[in-house]
């Protein structure tokens, strides 16, 4: 996969591992043409648009150009903003810090809830009730609490088999 990381985020997750992406003024602006050229060079046909919070932007032009390359496009979003663009897969990861846009629930292909403490399980269930029946459900331990939360997630998933465990494999392998 090719990851396109867009700068800018006002959600403010305390555990965010890319806080350097929050201030869009700290990063250079790349043209869509440059981004498309870079993607084209990889010959990769799967693109993940992430952030920051990529849904802060109208992504129609970028996704249109990626579709011309016959790319499959995934979006990772907190769901705070309306989703504007053409996506094949939407990973919706709501945060307690900012209420999600109600229209995002019906567009989500995947609901991913970060588990920071025990109360996040009931919060996850509340959000799962609002997404479509085909939406995949994932619980991911917050990295600094991984040792504490992973066993609780495993127990929860055993008792709620509609949920899956999402692990940040790249962190276990020390790959950035």
Where are these regions (language model features)?
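Conserved AdoMet/S-adenosylmethionine-binding subsite of the radical SAM
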Residues: 55-176
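Conserved Radical SAM active-site core
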Residues: 1-7, 12-87
């Amino acid at each position: 996969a090719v990851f396109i990381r867009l700068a800018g985020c006002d959600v403010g997750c305390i555990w965010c591992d890319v806080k350097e992406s929050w201030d869009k003024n700290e990063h250079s602006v790349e043209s869509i043409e440059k981004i498309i050229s870079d993607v084209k060079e990889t010959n990769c046909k799967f693109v993940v648009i992430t952030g920051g919070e990529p849904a802060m932007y109208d992504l129609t032009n970028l996704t249109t150009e990626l579709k011309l390359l016959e790319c499959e496009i995934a979006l990772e979003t907190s769901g705070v903003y309306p989703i504007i663009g053409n996506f094949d897969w939407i990973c919706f990861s709501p945060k307690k810090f900012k209420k999600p846009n109600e229209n995002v629930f019906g567009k989500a292909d995947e609901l991913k809830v970060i588990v920071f403490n025990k109360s996040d399980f009931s919060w996850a269930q509340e959000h799962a009730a609002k997404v479509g029946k085909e939406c995949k459900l994932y619980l991911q331990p917050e990295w600094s609490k991984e040792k504490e939360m992973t066993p609780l997630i495993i127990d929860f998933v055993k008792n709620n088999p509609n949920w899956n465990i999402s692990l940040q494999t790249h962190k276990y392998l020390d790959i950035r």
